[in-house]
């Protein structure tokens, strides 16, 4: 996307979105200036410079998670990290996505957005898309309160940001696809999973698309155990299309947990630990 076009779209952001971006850029600028004094050179060095690398390592996106497992079947019980990387290696620090050759080929043909039908327990299934500048949304999200995803038993806690334990969590974020009250795209997710874990990777995806104008193959699968109404977590995968994953690539499992709260995943009931 060209700079002029990005400027026009950015102008439509809500004040809250602008404030978040301003704060992130301000933080990066302050740290970049400080590192320049220490390391020497100009803050306008290329992305490969020592300053840029140091800035990315400090204020990046919180995506450099040290916990990694070989496969989705090896996910450990939650301890203190909100997500784990799957099949990570030197070229894929945030995990290697498992898209098939056919899925990658489909992504090269054009954008698509598909959601699974709800199952017999009214649970969501996999959400799958090719995202790009044509799918990003800068409009204010509409109300989604009309949707009550499976396991929605809301209680409030003083130690949870915003009070409510649960969010109506988009599998594919509204900012990435423009979907609002789509029951096939909303699950019962904890505040921690929705705003700390998933948002980390959603923001990476949006920034990559905005910065490059390229496309991203993207898949999110809620992970339910048999008969349970609340997902134990979500499996998120992404791979940039035009550069074969060189610009963006992740395969992570985000835990649907909230520190200090015990959740009955069968019913959605919950209480302070």
Q: What is the role of each PLM region?
A:
Residues 1-23:
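N-terminal Lys/Arg-rich, disordered targeting/topogenic segments
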Residues 17-28, 53-56, 60:
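Short hydrophobic helices that act as membrane-entry/anchoring signals
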Residues 27-43:
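Hydrophobic membrane-insertion alpha-helices, especially the h-region
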Residues 40-61:
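Sec-dependent signal peptide cleavage junction
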Residues 56-116:
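N-terminal module-boundary/linker segments of secreted carbohydrate-active enzymes
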Residues 99-273:
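Domain-level detector of nuclease and nuclease-like folds
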